[in-house]
Amino acid sequence: MKIALFGGSFDPPHNGHNSVVLEALEKLDIDKLIIMPTYINPFKQSFSADEKQRFLWVKKLWGHLPKVEICDFETKQKRPVPSIESVKYLYKLYNPSKFYLLIGADHLEKLHLWHDFEKLNSLVEFVIANRNDIEIPKNFKDLKTDKKIASSFIRNTLNTNEVCEEIKDEVKKYYEKLQKN
């Protein structure tokens, strides 16, 4: 079995994430795409939307797609989970012949700082979701995406133009409520 893991904060999920999901399904030779929202990113202090809400949004957006599985492994841990831990968990579950790890190009600069990076690098093939035509190292796969949007922009401005249509209204209401509190 060939699998790909796309983990992320999804705070909120948006058209950029959707572009990565659709491109991965189309361009990668995989049997399963596992989308795994984080409880909290090991490099961040907090999130705006709680893990349950982000998981529900992700499930609503992509849970119905063929070959897609939404996995709650990290959200159930109630702590920051390094990617290597999630990868090892999925190896035990699926014993894949090929394992792709999808990350945004914005993570390339600090990738060497990830927990147990050398081991992680030996277990997966990195696929870089490249939205800014950044030069990708030769040993990584380049997955071109056409959306240049950041979740922080949506949270800060409440501009939901780039939020996936299926959750646009609830995302706007959710972040408006957070800003009022």
Swiss-Prot record:
What does the entry give for GO biological process? NAD biosynthetic process
Name the pathway: Cofactor biosynthesis; NAD(+) biosynthesis; deamido-NAD(+) from nicotinate D-ribonucleotide: step 1/1
Catalytic reaction(s) noted:
nicotinate beta-D-ribonucleotide + ATP + H(+) = deamido-NAD(+) + diphosphate
Which terms does the record give in the GO molecular function aspect? ATP binding; nicotinate-nucleotide adenylyltransferase activity
Recorded hits in Pfam families, A to Z, give: CTP_transf_like
Q: What class of enzyme is it?
A: transferase
What keywords appear on the UniProt entry?
Answer: ATP-binding, NAD, Nucleotide-binding, Nucleotidyltransferase, Pyridine nucleotide biosynthesis, Transferase
Instruction: Cite the EC number.
Output: 2.7.7.18
Report the family membership: Belongs to the NadD family.
Q: Write down the PANTHER family for this protein, in alphabetical order.
A: NICOTINATE-NUCLEOTIDE ADENYLYLTRANSFERASE-RELATED, PHOSPHOPANTETHEINE ADENYLYLTRANSFERASE
Function, in words: Catalyzes the reversible adenylation of nicotinate mononucleotide (NaMN) to nicotinic acid adenine dinucleotide (NaAD).
Record's protein name: Probable nicotinate-nucleotide adenylyltransferase
Q: Which gene encodes it?
A: nadD
